[in-house]
């Protein structure tokens, strides 16, 4: 979800159905990229500073942005670009929805 040019929320949910549970390489790739981004946001202090929140529930990931920060936007754009690159090869297994606030 975006407000003008800034990312305000990212949701990653569901299962790619590329392979059986536990052996799905598409899910593993998406999870690895998303986990790396979440760890980066935490290490850079954005969670502690309450500029964003990460909600992990039932295998789903949601990142909510409360206060805009240019560095955080670069990190989040990295996630979006990585997910978009997955869709180039696995478009039948990954759906990206873009919303404007």
Where are the predicted features?
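N-terminal intrinsically disordered, cationic/polar leader segments
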Residues: 1-25, 35, 39-101
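Phosphate-binding glycine-rich loops of NTP-binding sites
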Residues: 32
